[in-house]
């Protein structure tokens, strides 16, 4: 599983919720996600909406463009949103699923399982 966040507490929360089922690889910026997808071939990509120089929405859109160009295999993407109003952004970015922070470990685990199931 690939996690893109620059916040240590988010990494800790996601690792606690999903780390038992997945190896969590972390990048600190959205611009690092594509290279990490190529290198690690994750089953799931978790993007925080607000990350460094390239936010979760732009990163998700970039992954979708790369998929359509057949440069990467299809990715399952879960976005961690700041508020309910951000659901619109997750839909526009074509995320497979999303969770509104603060992260509820059970909700995140369930959402990740649903996203992986397709």
Model-found features: residue ranges?
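C-terminal output helix
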Residues: 103-112
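His-Asp phosphorelay/catalytic-motif detector in bacterial-type signaling
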Residues: 43, 68-76
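Acidic, metal-coordinating helix/loop segments flanking the phosphotransfer/catalytic sites
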Residues: 28-44
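Conserved acidic segment of CheY-like receiver
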Residues: 1-15
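Alpha4 helix (beta4-alpha4-beta5 surface) of REC/receiver domains from two-component response regulators
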Residues: 58, 79-97
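Two-component signal transduction core modules
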Residues: 45, 98-99
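Conserved phosphotransfer microenvironments
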Residues: 43-65
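Conserved sequence signature across two-component system core domains
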Residues: 4-6, 27, 45, 80
